[in-house]
Amino acid sequence: MRNQIILFGWITLLLFPIPGFCLQYYFNDISFIEFISLQDFEIIPIAYGIQFGVFYAFIAYLFMKAPYFDKIPVKVNKLVHNMKLTVADGLFLSLCAGVGEELLFRQGIQSFTGVIFTSILFVALHGYLNPFNLRFSVYGLIVLPFILLISYGLDSFGIWFCIAAHFAYDAVLFTFMIKEGKQSESNNKELI
């Protein structure tokens, strides 16, 4: 399963940006270099993005630990644990998601559909707004403000702010979940 997840990471990184670029190229005649905004690759917006992503990830993590979420049938941390990922895998997947998804949604789609619709679509496509699992949808309502804020940040700080925030958010949560999974696994072995 781990190899499949790493493959999905590569697909996200390399293939997700293509439809966004095609939209921008066809309708706005934007080159690939303009699409990835290399001219905006600056330390300050990236640092702001990392700070914001880390901060919001800690808030989301605290909410995810609330007893309310104990009754979710399949918890995200259990899914991550079952993938047998290392922290390095989690960081790689975070980078893939940050770059691939932000180039697709923020850089590609958002200029056509607007911030609010694109943000809701982004959260819904991740499965976090699920009418059949209202308890899990509460997590979607926790992550939606984060996505809205980085979406609005695109105009002021650029795409690399969005990528950095998304990467940092995912990296913190992946790291927590991977470490917790290994800790609970070692605790279970001690009981045997």
Name each model feature, range by range.
Residues 5-6, 37-42, 114, 133:
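Alpha-helix initiation/capping motif
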Residues 1-13:
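N-terminal membrane topogenic signal
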Residues 1, 31, 39-42, 135-137, ...:
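Serine/threonine-rich low-complexity intrinsically disordered regions
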Residues 16-20, 170:
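Helical transmembrane-bundle signal
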Residues 22-97, 183, 190-192:
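Juxtamembrane helix-loop-helix connectors linking adjacent transmembrane helices
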Residues 81-192:
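Transmembrane helix-loop-helix hairpins at the membrane interface
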